[in-house]
Curated annotation (Swiss-Prot):
Entry GO CC: chloroplast
InterPro entries for the chain: NblA, NblA_sf
Chain segments annotated as coiled-coil in the UniProt record: none
Name of the protein: Uncharacterized protein ycf18
Record's subcellular location: Plastid, Chloroplast
Chief site of localization: plastid
Alphabetized Gene3D superfamilies for the sequence: Phycobilisome degradation protein NblA
Keywords: Chloroplast, Plastid
Family to which this protein belongs: Belongs to the ycf18/nblA family.
Length: 58
């Protein structure tokens, strides 16, 4: 069974914390948080690509 698209219990908890953080924000604040989160995800993708590209286990 492929579970790579499912969240772990820890990730589910983290998601609840994010929702609690977002609820009191106004639209502009929420949009800024979204942009920063997307930027962080893109940087994470770049790091993963770099590690895979430079891995000796290919």
């Amino acid at each position: 069974m492929d579970i790579s698209n499912q969240l772990t219990l820890e990730q589910e908890f983290e998601l609840v914390l994010y929702k609690q953080k977002i609820d009191p924000l106004n639209l502009e604040q929420a949009q800024n948080l979204l942009v920063e989160t997307l930027k962080t995800m893109m940087l994470k993708d770049n790091i993963i690509k770099y590690v895979v590209k430079n891995s000796h286990f290919r």
